[in-house]
Amino acid sequence: RKLAFRYRRVKELYNTYKNNIGGLLGPAKRDAWLQLRAEIEALTDSWLTNALKSLSIISTRSNCVNVLVTTTQLIPALAKVLLYSLGGAFPIENIYSATKIGKESCFERIVSRFGTNIT
Protein backbone atom coordinates (compact mmCIF):
# COMPACT_ATOMS: atom_id res chain seq x y z
CA ARG A 1 0.00 0.00 0.00
CA LYS A 2 2.80 2.39 0.91
CA LEU A 3 4.50 1.79 -2.43
CA ALA A 4 1.24 2.30 -4.34
CA PHE A 5 0.70 5.60 -2.52
CA ARG A 6 4.25 6.69 -3.32
CA TYR A 7 3.79 5.99 -7.03
CA ARG A 8 0.42 7.78 -7.09
CA ARG A 9 2.13 10.80 -5.55
CA VAL A 10 4.99 10.60 -8.06
CA LYS A 11 2.48 10.41 -10.92
CA GLU A 12 0.61 13.41 -9.51
CA LEU A 13 3.81 15.47 -9.27
CA TYR A 14 4.95 14.39 -12.73
CA ASN A 15 1.64 15.32 -14.32
CA THR A 16 1.49 18.62 -12.44
CA TYR A 17 4.97 19.76 -13.47
CA LYS A 18 5.52 17.97 -16.80
CA ASN A 19 5.10 21.24 -18.69
CA ASN A 20 6.45 23.55 -15.98
CA ILE A 21 9.45 22.18 -14.11
CA GLY A 22 10.34 25.75 -13.13
CA GLY A 23 7.30 25.78 -10.86
CA LEU A 24 8.73 22.86 -8.92
CA LEU A 25 12.25 24.27 -8.68
CA GLY A 26 11.53 27.75 -7.34
CA PRO A 27 12.91 31.05 -8.69
CA ALA A 28 16.64 30.70 -7.87
CA LYS A 29 17.02 27.11 -9.05
CA ARG A 30 14.79 27.84 -12.04
CA ASP A 31 17.12 30.62 -13.20
CA ALA A 32 20.19 28.39 -12.77
CA TRP A 33 18.40 25.59 -14.63
CA LEU A 34 17.46 27.91 -17.51
CA GLN A 35 21.08 29.09 -17.77
CA LEU A 36 22.34 25.50 -17.80
CA ARG A 37 19.77 24.56 -20.47
CA ALA A 38 20.92 27.49 -22.62
CA GLU A 39 24.55 26.37 -22.28
CA ILE A 40 23.66 22.77 -23.18
CA GLU A 41 21.78 24.00 -26.25
CA ALA A 42 24.74 26.12 -27.33
CA LEU A 43 27.28 23.32 -26.83
CA THR A 44 25.19 20.59 -28.48
CA ASP A 45 23.94 22.41 -31.55
CA SER A 46 20.39 22.62 -30.14
CA TRP A 47 19.95 18.87 -29.79
CA LEU A 48 17.25 19.26 -27.14
CA THR A 49 15.20 21.65 -29.25
CA ASN A 50 15.47 19.31 -32.22
CA ALA A 51 14.60 16.27 -30.10
CA LEU A 52 11.56 18.06 -28.69
CA LYS A 53 10.40 18.99 -32.19
CA SER A 54 10.69 15.38 -33.34
CA LEU A 55 8.92 14.00 -30.28
CA SER A 56 6.20 16.61 -30.63
CA ILE A 57 5.56 15.66 -34.25
CA ILE A 58 5.32 12.00 -33.29
CA SER A 59 2.92 12.65 -30.40
CA THR A 60 0.55 14.67 -32.59
CA ARG A 61 -0.01 11.72 -34.92
CA SER A 62 -3.19 9.85 -34.11
CA ASN A 63 -1.66 6.38 -34.31
CA CYS A 64 1.69 7.13 -32.65
CA VAL A 65 2.98 7.42 -29.08
CA ASN A 66 6.37 8.10 -27.58
CA VAL A 67 7.75 5.38 -25.30
CA LEU A 68 10.90 5.67 -23.22
CA VAL A 69 12.86 2.67 -21.92
CA THR A 70 15.78 3.37 -19.63
CA THR A 71 18.19 1.44 -17.45
CA THR A 72 18.01 4.26 -14.91
CA GLN A 73 15.77 3.67 -11.90
CA LEU A 74 12.28 5.05 -12.43
CA ILE A 75 12.27 8.06 -10.08
CA PRO A 76 15.62 9.48 -11.27
CA ALA A 77 14.54 8.82 -14.87
CA LEU A 78 11.33 10.79 -14.34
CA ALA A 79 13.34 13.63 -12.82
CA LYS A 80 15.61 13.70 -15.87
CA VAL A 81 12.63 13.69 -18.23
CA LEU A 82 11.22 16.71 -16.39
CA LEU A 83 14.55 18.54 -16.23
CA TYR A 84 15.01 18.14 -19.98
CA SER A 85 11.41 19.37 -20.53
CA LEU A 86 10.42 16.07 -22.11
CA GLY A 87 7.43 15.50 -19.83
CA GLY A 88 4.96 16.74 -22.41
CA ALA A 89 6.28 14.23 -24.94
CA PHE A 90 6.23 11.20 -22.63
CA PRO A 91 3.14 10.35 -20.59
CA ILE A 92 4.28 8.76 -17.34
CA GLU A 93 2.55 5.51 -18.33
CA ASN A 94 4.91 5.28 -21.32
CA ILE A 95 8.14 5.47 -19.32
CA TYR A 96 9.64 2.10 -18.44
CA SER A 97 12.62 1.36 -16.22
CA ALA A 98 14.54 -1.82 -17.01
CA THR A 99 16.59 -1.60 -13.82
CA LYS A 100 14.79 -4.33 -11.89
CA ILE A 101 13.05 -6.33 -14.63
CA GLY A 102 15.48 -6.03 -17.55
CA LYS A 103 15.12 -4.63 -21.04
CA GLU A 104 13.57 -7.76 -22.48
CA SER A 105 10.71 -7.68 -19.96
CA CYS A 106 10.17 -3.99 -20.66
CA PHE A 107 9.87 -4.61 -24.38
CA GLU A 108 7.55 -7.58 -23.77
CA ARG A 109 5.27 -5.29 -21.75
CA ILE A 110 5.37 -2.67 -24.50
CA VAL A 111 4.50 -5.24 -27.17
CA SER A 112 1.65 -6.63 -25.06
CA ARG A 113 0.32 -3.10 -24.53
CA PHE A 114 0.75 -1.65 -28.02
CA GLY A 115 1.00 -4.71 -30.27
CA THR A 116 3.73 -5.88 -32.61
CA ASN A 117 3.24 -3.29 -35.36
CA ILE A 118 5.53 -0.73 -33.74
CA THR A 119 8.55 1.27 -34.89
Swiss-Prot record:
Write down what this protein is called.
Protein phosphatase EYA4
State the EC number(s): 3.1.3.48
Keywords assigned by UniProt?
Activator, Chromatin regulator, Cytoplasm, Developmental protein, DNA damage, DNA repair, Hydrolase, Magnesium, Nucleus, Protein phosphatase, Transcription, Transcription regulation
Q: Cofactor: bound how, per the entry note?
A: Binds 1 Mg(2+) ion per subunit.
Q: What does this protein do?
A: Tyrosine phosphatase that specifically dephosphorylates 'Tyr-142' of histone H2AX (H2AXY142ph). 'Tyr-142' phosphorylation of histone H2AX plays a central role in DNA repair and acts as a mark that distinguishes between apoptotic and repair responses to genotoxic stress. Promotes efficient DNA repair by dephosphorylating H2AX, promoting the recruitment of DNA repair complexes containing MDC1. Its function as histone phosphatase probably explains its role in transcription regulation during organogenesis. May be involved in development of the eye.
GO biological process assignments: chromatin organization; DNA repair
Q: Which co-factors does it depend on?
A: Mg(2+)
Q: Which family does it belong to?
A: Belongs to the HAD-like hydrolase superfamily. EYA family.
Q: Tell me the GO molecular function terms.
A: protein tyrosine phosphatase activity
The residues forming the signal peptide are none
